[in-house]
């Protein structure tokens, strides 16, 4: 049977842990087996207690204190230490057959866009433990208010997609907070979800320094040429929204294809007697 590893990624405060908790709650409510894996060595609080926790192996506080590293350097060191101790990870997660593992990842963007550690970890899970990985990248919907920030987020998402090389789902999180913003129409929202690169030209060029216009044009061309980044809306507090995202993860990992058909419910003896 299939084993799925969903890596929930994104910048700090994008709602990763909240989404992980919502996904865990929904899957438990529909009877699906899942476990939370915390790979953030600086994490503090969780809605669901992690089944596997990198802090049992190494803590970023210890690294920063003993090696005098900053937060980002400490995080990279923790992941390098994890890669040197994959036997620990194999032992922790190797027994979870036919299960979903939801990986709650740190918020440092360089881990997804610049450093090759995470792709190496994903390949290990694929080859050694036979997991089917999927990346779920969260971008906060409030970025839509500032188009330049939104496209910076799009470029980060695209960089993560290229770096990680696994099925990838991009989410605009905290959509419930966007409902109070009357400056974004439904038509505009659709353009953001489909990442219309022309949103970066026109009005923006009227308010930015002319020396950046050519840069804007090049970014538009890059996004248009790759045509990789689209978004799904996410409200972590909305069960229907979480269910929809889960269906996309299932499709990306081909989870449905490996499910055995269930036997039809049998009539109870009393029901059969009544029919007679």
UniProtKB/Swiss-Prot annotation:
The record marks 72 as: Stabilizes the phosphate intermediate. InterPro entries: Gpn, Gpn3, P-loop_NTPase. One of its GO terms (cellular component) is nucleus. It comes from the Eukaryota. Its EC number is 3.6.5.-. The keyword Nucleotide-binding applies. The keyword Nucleotide-binding applies. Keywords: Cytoplasm, GTP-binding, Hydrolase, Nucleotide-binding, Nucleus. GO terms for biological process: protein import into nucleus. It is an enzyme of class 3 (hydrolase). It holds the Pfam family ATP_bind_1. It is found in: Cytoplasm; Nucleus. GO terms for molecular function: GTP binding; GTPase activity. GTP binds at residues 13-18, 173-176. CDD domains: GPN3. Residues 257-276 are annotated as: Disordered. Heterodimers with gpn1 or gpn2. Binds to RNA polymerase II (RNAPII). Small GTPase required for proper nuclear import of RNA polymerase II and III (RNAPII and RNAPIII). May act at an RNAP assembly step prior to nuclear import. Belongs to the GPN-loop GTPase family. This is GPN-loop GTPase 3. It comes from Schizosaccharomyces pombe (strain 972 / ATCC 24843). The lineage of its organism: Eukaryota, Fungi, Dikarya, Ascomycota, Taphrinomycotina.
